[in-house]
């Protein structure tokens, strides 16, 4: 399944999503930053989707991210590193359930499944 939508994050969403950070001194400012504007939530699927998306995103610290990744090219610092990516399939499933309703996700036959995979390419 796949999906995409604009989301206005609120305190409850962020407290749940970043529950492992609530006691950190930067958490309040992180929440304030993330609630300033809507964010784009995207659900992707595919072979090794979590690992492939994480390659595109880059290291959490933009200074350590490889050139050409989203964080290296577009982020300034760790607290505002521009993008979140799930670290595992299990985490992704929890995050999808947190931010998307079932009717906001779509299942369809991809062209790659129809043509490339049948040919063994």
Task: Pin down the residues of each PLM region.
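Non-catalytic terminal and connector segments of soluble metabolic enzymes
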Residues: 1-121
């Amino acid at each position: 399944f796949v999906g995409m939508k604009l989301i206005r994050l609120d305190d409850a969403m962020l407290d749940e999503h970043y529950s492992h950070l609530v006691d950190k001194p930067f958490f309040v400012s992180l929440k304030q930053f993330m609630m300033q504007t809507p964010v784009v939530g995207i659900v992707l699927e595919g072979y090794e989707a979590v690992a492939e998306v994480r390659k595109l995103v880059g290291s959490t610290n933009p200074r350590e991210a490889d050139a050409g990744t989203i964080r290296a090219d577009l982020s300034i610092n760790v607290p505002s590193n521009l993008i979140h990516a799930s670290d595992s399939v299990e985490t992704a499933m929890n995050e999808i359930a947190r931010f998307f309703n079932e009717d906001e996700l779509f299942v369809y036959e991809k062209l790659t499944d129809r043509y490339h995979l049948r040919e063994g390419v």
